[in-house]
From Swiss-Prot:
InterPro entries: Thymidylate_synthase_ThyX, Thymidylate_synthase_ThyX_sf. CDD domains: ThyX (cd20175). Pathway: Pyrimidine metabolism; dTTP biosynthesis. The keyword Cytoplasm does not apply. It catalyses: dUMP + (6R)-5,10-methylene-5,6,7,8-tetrahydrofolate + NADPH + H(+) = dTMP + (6S)-5,6,7,8-tetrahydrofolate + NADP(+). It comes from the Bacteria. A motif (ThyX motif) lies at residues 95-105. GO terms for biological process: dTMP biosynthetic process; dTTP biosynthetic process; methylation. Residues 7-233 form the ThyX domain. Its cofactor is FAD. This is Flavin-dependent thymidylate synthase. DUMP binds at residues 92-95, 103-107, 172, 199.
Length: 250
């Protein structure tokens, strides 16, 4: 029986920073946010912090976002491992070309026991949920039947790995958009902010918006100043969105 799966977003990597011993400079931050500040101060040789209004790391980072000097954010990056995301949502995700992606392969991984993501509008209605899951079970049956028939058709191929790959790459054509995928996503902080501005918006698809808000929560833990301007709100339907006064590039 087809099983639904919940969204899981984990931050698995984030930029670290080792200040050069040759530069007389210190900061009250560390890691990615310290790196961004260092890059900015390197542009103007302001390691002595001549402006008291931007002497702290938080004040400095807020200033660069206020004036739009967000190219500095490209020096820091974060990597997420996302599971419990539908294949259709990953199609939206991979449109963000400044990210780097490594996605679960349907050619090499058997999808006969696939888990699925149920759209909330369907999931909240017992009758629609039942209909949806029956459709997924029927789809899985067809996929497995096709896969078995294709492997028999290719039995003359001596390479077992190639035989399975060829069968799966043909059978996957019937897999639904709701099929769970798993994907590793790496992006610099500027790219993550652009993604959040577009996909955490109330106008975005519900699933990709949930992914964006989950990513935001992880990013805030690592870089609270860089991402702290995004405010999460709960909409009338119970879903969440996030907005920032600094995000205008859509």
């Amino acid at each position: 029986m087809t099983e639904p799966v919940e969204l899981s977003v984990e931050l698995i990597a984030c930029s670290s920073f080792t200040p050069p011993a040759s530069v007389a400079w210190d900061t009250d931050a560390h890691g990615a946010e310290a790196l961004v500040e260092f890059a900015g101060r390197a542009c103007y040789e302001t390691f002595d912090k001549p402006n008291p209004r931007t002497a702290t790391n938080a004040a400095y980072l807020r200033h660069i976002m206020e004036v739009g000097h967000t190219a500095l954010l490209e020096h820091a990056s974060a990597t997420m491992y996302i599971r419990g995301i539908s294949r259709s949502a990953t199609h939206e995700l991979v449109r963000h070309r400044h990210f780097s992606f490594s996605q679960l392969s349907q050619r090499f991984v058997h999808e006969g026991e696939q888990e699925v993501i149920i759209p909330e509008l369907i999931n909240e209605d017992p009758q629609l949920r039942s209909l949806f899951l029956r459709a997924m079970d029927d789809n899985r049956f067809v996929y497995n039947e096709l896969l078995n028939a294709l492997e028999e058709k290719l039995e003359g191929e001596p390479n077992a790995l190639l035989r399975k790959k060829q069968a799966r790459q043909a059978a996957r054509a019937v897999l639904p958009n709701a099929t769970e995928s798993r994907i590793v996503v790496t992006g610099n902080f500027r790219s993550w902010r652009h993604f959040l501005g577009m996909r955490a918006s109330e106008h975005a698809d519900v699933e990709i918006r949930a992914v964006a808000v989950a990513c935001l929560e992880k990013l805030k833990q690592q870089a609270p100043t860089v991402f702290g301007d995004f405010q999460v709100e709960t909409l009338a339907d119970g879903t969440q969105m996030a907005t920032s006064p600094y995000v205008t590039d859509f």
